[in-house]
């Protein structure tokens, strides 16, 4: 890894018809132009890009990809939820040394959550659910009302129901008699992990927060 950067574009913002908003698309176009200029100035000859749930589900998603091609001259691959899960698994493999046991990997994104059952050799089950941090915020927290117990219970039930098909698929493929560990990725996972550590103590072995650094 030579360089890392991140830009929050909130592409998952939708209008009343579920389309990507002009403001969010403009933010993405501006970001892609900046990244492309950086690649050009550093001699990069191949740019690999992918679009996930926000573009997959928007009625104007493919129109937006055509716009990127026209305005920025970058071709973005629209990947499925399963392919997104597979790439998350490969990302974990590239950044961590997995032991000879089973792992459940969870990635909480803006519009979807991926659950993966895997080991050090292969991904055994790949799942993707239409529940994510930005989606939940847009659907349930547009007002400024505090989250009371009733609202919290409803949201918990909604999330559990949304994830149930993925969880059942993982459970059916779980190997018997093997230790299973969980790995959570994404910024949401890091924030939750830090909250857990602040409550349990940084020396607690039940939860570790690992920030991968470039070499």
Annotate each language-model stretch with its function:
Residues 14-42, 52-102, 117-120, 125-215:
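Helical "lid/coupling" subdomains associated with nucleotide-phosphate turnover
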Residues 3, 51-52:
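A secondary-structure boundary/capping signal
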Residues 107:
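Conserved catalytic-loop position in the HRD/HxD motif
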Residues 45:
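Short acidic/polar active-site loop segments enriched in Thr and Asp
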Residues 1-6, 42:
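N-terminal glycine-rich anion-binding loops that anchor highly charged ligand groups
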Residues 1, 113-117:
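Short beta-strand scaffold segments in enzyme catalytic cores
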Residues 9-10:
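Pseudouridine synthases involved in rRNA/tRNA modification
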């Amino acid at each position: 890894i030579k360089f890392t950067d991140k830009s929050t574009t909130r592409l998952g913002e939708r209008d009343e018809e579920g389309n990507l908003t002009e403001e969010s698309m403009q933010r993405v176009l501006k970001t892609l132009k900046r990244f492309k200029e950086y690649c050009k100035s550093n001699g990069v000859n191949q740019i690999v890009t992918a679009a996930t749930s926000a573009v997959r589900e928007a009625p104007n998603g493919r129109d937006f990809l055509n716009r990127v091609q026209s305005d920025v001259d970058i071709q973005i691959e629209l990947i499925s939820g399963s392919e997104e899960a597979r790439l998350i698994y490969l990302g974990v493999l590239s950044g961590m040394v997995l032991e000879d046991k089973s792992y459940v990997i969870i990635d909480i994104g803006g519009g979807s959550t991926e659950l993966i059952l895997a080991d050090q050799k292969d991904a055994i089950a790949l799942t993707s659910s239409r529940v994510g941090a930005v989606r939940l915020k847009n659907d349930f927290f547009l007002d400024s009302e505090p989250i009371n117990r009733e609202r919290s219970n409803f949201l918990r039930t909604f999330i559990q129901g949304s994830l149930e098909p993925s969880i059942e698929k993982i459970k059916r493929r779980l190997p018997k008699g093997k230790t299973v560990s969980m790995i959570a990725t994404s910024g949401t996972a890091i924030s939750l992990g830090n909250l857990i550590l602040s409550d349990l103590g940084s020396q607690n072995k039940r939860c570790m927060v690992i920030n991968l650094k470039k070499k």
